[in-house]
């Protein structure tokens, strides 16, 4: 699912949407801004629009992808600038992706650290290191 992040980071939103299952659920309820759930490809488009309303140049840097069966834990950072404040942000972020039929069916964003995201998929730090 590296291709989803690559598409989003280079601004190719339609490619990212193509990689999503028609029934995708994007859970952004852990986020400070726009904390809600988005459903379907139209929901994904709305999330992208909502993100643009708050951030300039928002992108993610992925440091690690951890395989958890049909799920993937992505550890990295969110980088961008607040539209209203002009404050540059670079904060740790973890995301959990669920794959079905080779497509992204669930995108859970807003985990603030690695441990929290690993627990969401039933893994411990030890489990994650064993797979490395």
Mark where each language-model region is.
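C-terminal and inter-domain tail/linker signature
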Residues: 1-132
